[in-house]
Every structure is written in structure tokens, then in C-alpha cells.
Amino acid sequence: MFVLNELPPQIPRELTELLVKAEPATIGHFLDYGFMDPEIRSLLPDKRIAGTAVTCRFSGVDGTIMHYALGQIRPGDILVVDRGGDRRHAACGGGVCFAARAAGALGIIIDGPATDIGEIREYGLPVWSRGLSAVTSKRLFTQGEFCVPVSCGGVTVTPGDAIVADENGILVLKKDQIEAVAKRAITMQQDEKPRLARVAKGERLPDINGTNAKIREIMAKK
């Protein structure tokens, strides 16, 4: 059975351009939720993307819906794939990644394996997956869901959510969270540079960030 829904509105470009400047690892200093399982890892180094989540879900071997998604996805979209717990069949390989890149997709995030790592590297489309598998999905035309709420890496992803992802992790945000979260992270990243400069000159980090002073205060109360 197929479930085919309409594409969601895209996140405005000014928000994704802001969000891509924010490192997920910086956001993780003040936000605990919305991060996918760290076992879903980037297959390409030094890549960060931020865009609109477009989702699909299929279980087992029938990956027909992946090919359907390639005809729907827009520039600036990130395809998020719920594999229903399947860890054996690769959801995408070189051909799908090449087609996704040609359609303008920013990347693919799979709660399951991918394949054709050499071609993925050659084509340069950022892909996150739970490793690799030589056993692939097939087009059997039996089932698949497009643009439905999915679970990926333990996080519910609704079509139209914002995604920011790099080799440190993947974060899902609602549109109304983007500006505040991104600006806070960017400020933290900017503040770190002068702090590291002080460390380079000989100061100790726990003196700069107040850790030593706070511990002395706590110990003095004993």
C-alpha cells in the first residue's frame, strides 16, 4: 500500500542560511532533545547542511518510494528515510544519490544502511546512515509512504521540519526554533575564539570559564 502526501512548505532561505552556520555540537551544549542517534553517521567528512525535511518510510526490501521521492524533491530539501527497523537492505546507492543531487537535494539521512560508498564520495552528496550494506532494496511496487511523520534515529520528523547535520550529528528543529537556537550557537562559537586565544597565551581554561572559582566556592561551604 502506498501513502502519498503533498510536499511541505520549505523553510525560508534566510533561516536555513542562518542555521547552517550553527554547529550541531555547539547546539548540543544547551539543547538535549531533537538529536538523532549518533550511530547514524556521516559518510562524507567536513559537510554541513541545513534545509527542509522531506520524509519517506518503507520497511524491508521494497524501496520503490525512494525512487518516487526523487521525482518530488526540491532544491533545498533533505530526504529523511525511516526504514522501519530494517538494518540489512541499503536504502540508497550511487544512482539514487546522483539523481538526488541533480534534483537539488542537500542530502539524505537514513535510519538504516546505504551502499556504493565510492560513488557517494565521488558524487559528493552528503549521506548519513547506519553504516553500509551490499544487500540493496528493490523496486517491487508493493508499499511505501511519502511525506508522513517518521521516526529517524529515535526522533520524530514531520515533513517541513528543519534539519541541520554534519559529521558530529543530526538535529531536528521546528521552524519557530531556528532563529533563537542558531543565533545562540553562533554567538557561542564566536565567543570561543578569544577564549582559546587566552589559553594559547598560558591561561588555564578552568580559570577562564569559572570552573575553579565555583569549585572553590563549593568546597569552602563544607
Model-identified regions with their sequence ranges:
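Feature captures the catalytic cores and cofactor-binding loops of soluble hydro-lyases/lyases
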Residues: 1-159, 173-222
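C-terminal binding/interaction regions
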Residues: 163
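Beta-strand-loop-alpha-helix segment that lines the small-molecule cofactor/substrate pocket
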Residues: 166
